[in-house]
From Swiss-Prot:
Mitochondrial matrix side: 33-73, 134-179, 234-267
Protein name: Putative mitochondrial transporter UCP3
GO molecular function, one term: proton transmembrane transporter activity
Topological relation to the membrane, as annotated: Multi-pass membrane protein
Gene that specifies this protein: Ucp3
Chain segments annotated as transmembrane: 11-32, 74-96, 117-133, 180-196, 214-233, 268-290
Organism per entry: Rattus norvegicus
Length: 308
């Protein structure tokens, strides 16, 4: 690495792993209220006659939550969300390039679209398997108003939520919804990582952009839109199933069929706008931060290894 500029040094797997988790946490801090609004809109109508608060639109949902539950309510579940990103994004994003290289035949300069999709599915599934308990707790906190009676909080804190779910529903309760979540995140990871990878590659090959902020911004925005379109139906089913009390749904398929019967097919795109606003803005913030963090971390590494 001696004599190379930081931008010329390929980032190590450790740099990508740490950079992805840190960048994802930063993006979560800025976009978490949109994710909470998405969850509230997705579960609206799930249990007719019980819900007293009606949510309309992204901004309306956030304002209603602030008015009825307090100004901190849009950030309910943030701690679990940060737990999730450090374990989830680090794997699905940080290991993507390494897994892609593993699947690419030796002697091949470029990975095919099929190889990239396979790598995205692999890291997405690995990430869900490790991070599912954090996702369950995050969703429970975001949907807290619907649990219990009289607006009382069921969990005293994030660690108490892990313990309570394990005690009342068994350890399997912490992995509730794993299969729909694996499906959802395999789709999202493919849409995000593969789309970002391809758009960025085409922009650089066509010399429309250099490897800088505008290139990262356009690539990330396109990745966020594609991910929202293809993943929304699975995301709604995942949210409903993970938030449901024991016995409401026999399986994710039963949840999906009940949604169609009671609310129609448009239920699969409930919360689409906050999903897009969240995924679009989240992808832009995450990928831009991730690219800069990789460069900064490699610069530090080059300086440490330089003899001068």
């Amino acid at each position: 690495m001696v004599g190379l500029q930081p931008s010329e040094v390929p980032p190590t797997t450790v740099v990508k792993f740490l950079g992805a988790g840190t960048a994802a946490c930063f993006a979560d801090l800025l976009t978490f209220p949109l994710d909470t609004a998405k969850v509230r809109l997705q579960i609206q109508g799930e249990n007719p006659g019980v819900q007293s608060v009606q949510y309309r639109g992204v901004l309306g949902t956030i304002l209603t939550m602030v008015r009825t539950e307090g100004p901190r309510s849009p950030y309910s579940g943030l701690v679990a969300g940060l737990h999730r990103q450090m374990s989830f994004a680090s794997i699905r994003i940080g290991l993507y390039d390494s897994v892609k290289q593993f699947y690419t035949p030796k002697g091949t300069d470029h990975s095919s679209v099929a190889i990239r999709i396979l790598a995205g599915c692999t890291t997405g599934a690995m990430a869900v398997t490790c991070a599912q308990p954090t996702d369950v707790v995050k969703v429970r906190f975001q949907a807290m108003i619907r649990l219990g009676t009289g607006g009382e909080r069921k969990y005293r804190g994030t660690m108490d939520a892990y313990r309570t779910i394990a005690r009342e529903e068994g350890v399997r309760g912490l992995w509730k919804g794993t299969w729909p979540n694996i499906t959802r995140n395999a789709i999202v990871n493919c849409a995000e990582m593969v789309t970002y990878d391809i758009i960025k590659e085409k922009l650089l090959d066509s010399h429309l952009f250099t490897d800088n902020f505008p290139c990262h911004f356009v690539s990330a925005f396109g990745a966020g839109f594609c991910a929202t379109v293809v993943a929304s139906p699975v995301d709604v089913v995942k949210t409903r199933y993970m938030n449901a009390p024991p016995g409401r749904y026999r399986s994710p398929l039963h949840c999906m069929l009940r949604m169609v019967a009671q609310e129609g097919p448009t239920a699969f795109y409930k919360g689409f706008m906050p999903s897009f606003l969240r995924l679009g803005s989240w992808n832009v913030m995450m990928f831009v931060t991730y690219e800069q963090l990789k460069r900064a971390l490699m610069k530090v590494q080059v300086l440490r290894e330089s003899p001068f």
